[in-house]
Amino acid sequence: MQNYENTYRRLLLYADSMKIIDTHEHLQPNQNYLGDQPDVLCDYLSHYITTDLMSAGMSGEDLEKVKDYKTDILKRFKILEPYLESVKNTSYYRALEIGAKKIHKINEISVRTIEELNEKFKKAAICEDYGRNIMKNLCNIEVSINDNWSQDMKFSTTDLFVPTCQFSPDGNLSENLTFDEYCENYRQYFLKQKNDGMKTIKNVMAYWRTLYVEDVDYNTAKDLYTEVLKNKIDFPRKLEDYMLHVLLKIADENNFVIQIHTGLQEGMGNNLENSNPMLLRNLFNKYQNLSFDIFHMGYPYERELIVLAKTYANVYIDLCWAHIISPVAARNAFYEMLDVLPYTKILGFGGDYCFFDGVVGHITMAKQDICEVLAKKICSGECDIDLAEKILQAVLHDNAKRVFKL
């Protein structure tokens, strides 16, 4: 029987030596997210851990005070400290602590260290190659699929990134456009993005509505479009549904991969039922030649998603965000995926961060999760080291390269 610790360490060393393809980020140019000057609290509290802090009782008003970089950082940290202490058990916090340690050589985030951490962060973040050094040298990432929440693809079209953009059904509305012209403009927009290097289109509509999409006929959609322009109303759901089908046909014709947010939504008080991946079955059936990259392992609907990926050849499971939502859930789901699915259906890592330090923590946790599961499978006799290394190479690199045609 294999020794678990030795096996785990061997796999981890192998993972550390590999180039990794990062399936999903929201990374920004430094000047976009650092504002007037770099500040580690503004950066680290830009998302994710803020949900834990607010869950622990922190008010939005106090959060804004903590992120006011013009105020002394010790004063701000004293507001943050009681809430931060109560979330130090969470995976979101752990990712930040790992990033602070690996990048800035600070072992904890505390009142004792915050000034030094901030000074080191500020000094590093103003360097032009800050992000490149993190992604290429610390993380060994070959390329990332990047949604920087911008219609300007320039930042995301470099050797660091491949751009993606979000489905927006009501973009570029104009009273001067007929419905047919509007649909054609939609098509031309995505063709332009394809020429700029885009490989995927991202659907995040589970944040505001159900993932279920009906079939809507042309005349109904055209009448609704006319009503929207005439009465200045929001896009009705049926018109959104029609435009999503337009998008999926464009994607099918142009070999785009559709990335879909499922499961847990970032932030407070969202409707989780909107995001169950089972709501997508009719699309998987209708567009069988189109590849669907289903995000966040569907958590907490990961078992439903595993079954979908098993029974639909065009459905892939993406563990982006998953390892910092819950490493335990990610490990359990990955173990089960390997029991149920071809390993070629699994995409193992996407940082899903808007700042670079977070990626370091997340990729560290992801490699630990994946290697722990594979080591357990080796030690239980379910696979040998050669197969485990093939799986590791596939889920962290080769599968994404093939699916996204990189």
List the predicted regions and their residue ranges.
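Short acidic/histidine-rich active-site segments
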Residues: 30, 261, 293-297, 318-321, ...
